[in-house]
């Protein structure tokens, strides 16, 4: 099925938000100004994507997703200055602590992401600012979404940097990531990690079945309707997400059920299960 869906004109989301009405617009503008101040002429472009652009953004809960493209490779940037800026900025806006995902990537690396050995510098929820040496091709889902749905906050059009990515490539990456989530160890993991895994798998299944990429909330509702016997677990994941990991999954029943549910969804995604939806 995946091989038959090779449409470059497919959009990732069925709806878009007005740029002037996006959530946290003042915060985003201030953060963009800080990033520009540190990078100066090294900044090629800065792009906002994710739920703050395409919908499903929950104030006080959702992350902000940004990609900063730079003219040099990330190893040549003043990473200490960027880290200090992140720390100071979140200190002024503590409600955004652990809610920023900013990816810094060199223009040449992003432009040839399928084959490039280049690195990324990333700050993300639960992780400090650091250089990641994994293949940038593993971030294909991000590159697709920022290219198809992102808002340019500064610089050149992202389509002039990221080469075209087909829907079938995005879909295949979604399937691979779902399988990775299934195989991750969640022994002793925090409640937020478990909720993220459940909702990520719901979204992956909905993406494969409906051929559209939507929000976690849309995916949860879609899966809940089709698998009512698992509604209680999906609801627990949603409640945990809204509490930012402070509520939910407090008993072994929920945690054990999580692994069963994730395996079931992964089998559905990979087409190994009986078609039941």
Question: What positions do the PLM features span?
Answer:
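Conserved NTP/Mg2+-binding pocket subregion across the NTase superfamily
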Residues: 15-16, 84-191, 198
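Catalytic metal-binding acidic patch
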Residues: 48-86, 99-104
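Nucleotidyltransferase catalytic cores
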Residues: 9, 152, 156, 160-277
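Helical scaffold of the NTase/Pol beta-like nucleotidyltransferase catalytic core
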Residues: 2-5, 9-47, 77-79, 276-277
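Glycine- and acidic
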Residues: 14-18, 68, 243-248
């Amino acid at each position: 099925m995946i091989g038959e869906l090779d449409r470059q004109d497919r959009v990732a989301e069925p709806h878009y938000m007005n740029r002037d009405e996006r959530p946290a617009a003042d915060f985003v503008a201030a953060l963009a100004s800080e990033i520009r101040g540190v990078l100066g002429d090294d900044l090629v472009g800065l792009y906002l994507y994710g739920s703050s652009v395409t919908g499903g953004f929950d104030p006080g809960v959702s992350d902000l997703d940004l990609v900063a493209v730079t003219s040099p490779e990330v190893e040549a940037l003043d990473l200490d200055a960027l880290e200090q800026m992140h720390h100071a900025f979140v200190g002024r806006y503590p409600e955004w602590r652990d809610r920023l995902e900013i990816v810094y990537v060199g223009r040449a690396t992003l432009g040839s992401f399928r084959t490039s050995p280049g690195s990324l510098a990333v700050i993300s929820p639960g992780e400090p600012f650091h250089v990641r040496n994994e293949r940038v091709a593993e971030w294909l889902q991000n590159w697709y979404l920022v290219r198809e749905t992102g808002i340019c906050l500064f610089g050149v059009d992202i389509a002039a940097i990221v080469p075209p990515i087909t829907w079938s490539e995005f879909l295949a990456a979604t399937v691979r990531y779902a399988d990775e989530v299934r195989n991750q160890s969640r022994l002793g993991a925090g409640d937020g990690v478990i909720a993220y895994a459940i909702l990520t798998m719901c979204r992956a299944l909905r993406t494969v079945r409906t051929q559209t990429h939507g929000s976690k909330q849309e995916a949860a509702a879609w899966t809940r309707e089709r698998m009512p016997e698992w509604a209680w677990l999906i609801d627990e994941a949603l409640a945990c997400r809204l509490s930012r990991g402070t509520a939910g999954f407090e008993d072994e029943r929920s945690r054990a059920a999580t692994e069963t549910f994730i395996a079931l969804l992964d089998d559905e995604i990979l087409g190994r299960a009986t078609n039941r939806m």
